[in-house]
């Protein structure tokens, strides 16, 4: 599995969200590259890894990334957070975990109210078969909905998406299956690495309340929460400076 490497300094692995690729992190990469060695992952079926044989499944992807990277902090955005959290819960080489607009459980459950209804993801999976492009555009609009810079962010996401090979329908449906059926809440209870959780105040896909609820499950003495005022589901597009400062401070304090 191909992983782009850039920069110099302490290692940081970045894993993107549904339908995108690692190019989405460009605003962060520009600022972090002078201070960190960045390992930019395109998930299987996405971007530069659109033909990789690695399946889009947590254990296989995490193993492939771990085999190609040194001890590092792992950052996961949205869907990418499931891979980062799984790695943090199972691999000793994960020095720290950054969950960016991501939670251990993306869909609403009886004991997990601050999340999207699973029917929304099911509908996206069905719509992909009928109209791929329209469905992707609708999801990108949800990524930016609520943000104070929604229109600008939407234009950025559309441009970024088309800069590399777009995932096929089967890959996207596999990602939706992960979002709909993965529940890693139990992994938080005994989480060993320190963690930073970043929420967009206006995020409509992963409400800030769900991220706050996740931090309660993790060890309190090793868990930090940052809420980006005015941020949506992709706060690194509109608040790159604030995000970069928070990431660097967190990484600098790791043992």
Swiss-Prot record:
It comes from the Bacteria. Substrate binds at residues 18, 78-79, 139-143, 233. Keywords: Biotin biosynthesis, Cytoplasm, Hydrolase, Serine esterase. GO terms for cellular component: cytoplasm. GO terms for biological process: biotin biosynthetic process. The keyword Hydrolase applies. Belongs to the AB hydrolase superfamily. Carboxylesterase BioH family. PANTHER family: HYDROLASE ALPHA/BETA FOLD FAMILY, PIMELOYL-[ACYL-CARRIER PROTEIN] METHYL ESTER ESTERASE. This is Pimeloyl-[acyl-carrier protein] methyl ester esterase. It comes from Xylella fastidiosa (strain Temecula1 / ATCC 700964).
